[in-house]
């Protein structure tokens, strides 16, 4: 079973969109196995965005993700990364398809509602940044046998 990390960013928390974002992921058949409201400190933000260090927008990324509370979650399911990425839509909401989270809810490329890991390696790394293993809960929903076989 594949797992991936999602972050409902400060803009979405401030706009009251957390429930809508989580609902859309659950409706795609994904199961939340970890979920928490938190403030990201600068050290974690730097580790999370390490690949962007040195880029012109790096400091803005850090300032934004540490500017207010976020909701961090781990979802699992077959092809969880692919399904999450398609449900999110393109990074730039102006290019995201209607019906995607970003296409419907995001305002700008800098305030685009949600982050999702883009590979199994990144998912594993990012999950480890935000969750201890004992914070992840495996369980079966009644509907899982219909979705996951």
UniProtKB/Swiss-Prot annotation:
Q: Which Pfam families match?
A: NDK
Q: What does this protein do?
A: Major role in the synthesis of nucleoside triphosphates other than ATP. The ATP gamma phosphate is transferred to the NDP beta phosphate via a ping-pong mechanism, using a phosphorylated active-site intermediate.
Q: Where in the sequence is the active site?
A: 115 (pros-phosphohistidine intermediate)
Family according to the record: Belongs to the NDK family.
Designated name of the protein: Nucleoside diphosphate kinase
Its UniProt entry gives the catalysed reaction(s) as:
a 2'-deoxyribonucleoside 5'-diphosphate + ATP = a 2'-deoxyribonucleoside 5'-triphosphate + ADP; a ribonucleoside 5'-diphosphate + ATP = a ribonucleoside 5'-triphosphate + ADP
Which GO terms of the molecular function aspect are on file? ATP binding; metal ion binding; nucleoside diphosphate kinase activity
Location of this chain's protein in the cell:
Cytoplasm
Task: Report residues binding ATP.
Answer: 9, 57, 85, 91, 102, 112
The record's note on quaternary structure and interaction partners says: Homotetramer.
The EC number(s) attached to this protein equal 2.7.4.6
Tell me which GO cellular component terms the UniProt record holds: cytoplasm
InterPro entries in the record: NDK-like_dom (IPR034907), NDK-like_dom_sf (IPR036850), Nucleoside_diP_kinase (IPR001564), Nucleoside_diP_kinase_AS (IPR023005)
Record keywords:
ATP-binding, Cytoplasm, Kinase, Magnesium, Metal-binding, Nucleotide metabolism, Nucleotide-binding, Phosphoprotein, Transferase
Q: Which SUPFAM superfamilies match?
A: Nucleoside diphosphate kinase, NDK
> PROSITE patterns, from UniProt?
NDPK (PS00469), NDPK_LIKE (PS51374)
Q: Needs which cofactor?
A: Mg(2+)
The record's Gene3D superfamilies line, in alphabetical order, gives: Nucleoside diphosphate kinase-like domain
* GO biological process, alphabetically ordered: CTP biosynthetic process; GTP biosynthetic process; UTP biosynthetic process
Location (main, coarse): cytoplasm
Signal peptide boundaries: none
């Amino acid at each position: 079973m594949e797992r991936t990390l999602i972050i409902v960013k400060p803009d979405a928390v401030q706009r009251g969109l957390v429930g809508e974002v989580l609902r859309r992921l659950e409706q795609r058949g994904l199961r939340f196995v970890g979920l928490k409201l938190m403030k990201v400190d600068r050290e974690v933000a730097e580790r999370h965005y390490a690949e962007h260090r040195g880029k012109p927008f790096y400091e803005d990324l850090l300032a934004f993700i540490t500017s207010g509370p976020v909701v961090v979650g781990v979802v699992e399911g077959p092809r969880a990364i692919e399904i999450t990425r398609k449900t999110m839509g393109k990074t730039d909401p102006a290019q995201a398809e209607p019906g995607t989270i970003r296409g419907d809810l995001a305002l700008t490329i800098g305030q685009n509602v949600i982050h999702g890991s883009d590979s199994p390696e990144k998912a594993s790394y990012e999950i480890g940044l935000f969750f201890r293993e004992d914070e992840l809960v495996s369980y079966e929903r009644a509907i899982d046998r219909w979705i996951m076989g």
